[in-house]
């Protein structure tokens, strides 16, 4: 039975990784900076406590926040956790005197993790989780101002900033209980992902189609 569970976990991990790298989990202009919006870490019990479950050590819960908690893995058992997350984004504001609104829905996996005992009071844990997400598209129009020494020659220009992508975290850790109520843990983490950002400026045509683009 333990071998079957390990095989199932091994099959689901690449599927979850593929789903994560092909989806957008954020819709915010603030994600244009750095690696984007960071996700709340941990499994559901940890997230329900606001992500402060570092000290939580239970034989029935996989604690992704603290590798020392892996030492609580019960003998002859295998803990497997798979989490899903759905979010709704709604924004309403006035633009040029008109009310406009946007709404987005996302649904994706949040974490996949397992924990198993290596020996008495020695446990191993593995997790694959989305670390951060990028998703934005903003548009700005610079009106024509003939009195401006620069923009008077350029004319009306429109700017579009957009980006999407994500960063995924994979973690492998070991926890060892030295004595009662005292455990040590160590973990190795690896991050990967793709974030694409682009900037396009379209001025009023002077010659040709008047379009210039630059991708960063």
Task: Pin down the residues of each PLM region.
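Short hydrophobic "helix-edge" motifs at membrane interfaces and signal-peptide entry regions
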Residues: 5, 55-57, 169-170
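N-terminal, post-signal peptide beta-strand-biased segments of exported outer-membrane/organellar beta-barrel
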Residues: 17-132
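Extracellular loop and loop/strand-boundary signature of outer-membrane beta-barrel proteins
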Residues: 96-100, 155-160, 208-216
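Well-ordered mid-protein domain cores that form the structural environment of catalytic cofactors
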Residues: 104-170
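Short acidic/polar capping segments at secondary-structure boundaries
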Residues: 131, 177-181, 188-195
């Amino acid at each position: 039975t333990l071998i079957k569970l390990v095989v199932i976990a091994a099959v689901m991990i690449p599927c979850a990784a593929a789903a994560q790298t092909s989806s957008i989990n954020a819709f915010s202009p603030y994600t244009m900076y750095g690696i984007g919006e960071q996700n709340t870490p941990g499994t559901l019990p940890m997230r329900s406590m606001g992500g402060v479950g570092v000290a939580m050590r239970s034989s029935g819960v996989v604690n992704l926040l603290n590798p020392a908690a892996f030492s609580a893995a019960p003998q002859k058992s295998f803990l497997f956790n798979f989490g899903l997350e759905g979010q709704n984004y709604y924004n309403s504001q006035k633009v040029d005197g008109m009310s406009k609104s946007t709404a987005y829905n996302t649904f994706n996996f949040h974490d996949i993790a397992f924990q198993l005992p290596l020996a008495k009071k020695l446990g191993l844990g593995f997790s694959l989780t989305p670390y951060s997400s990028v998703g934005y598209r903003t548009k700005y129009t610079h009106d024509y101002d003939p009195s401006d020494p620069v923009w008077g020659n350029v004319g009306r220009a429109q700017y579009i900033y957009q980006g999407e992508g994500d960063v995924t975290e994979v973690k492998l850790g070991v926890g060892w209980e030295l004595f009662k109520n005292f455990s040590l843990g160590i973990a190795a983490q690896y991050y990967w992902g793709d974030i694409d950002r682009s900037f396009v400026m379209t001025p009023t045509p002077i010659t040709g189609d008047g379009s210039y683009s630059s991708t960063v």
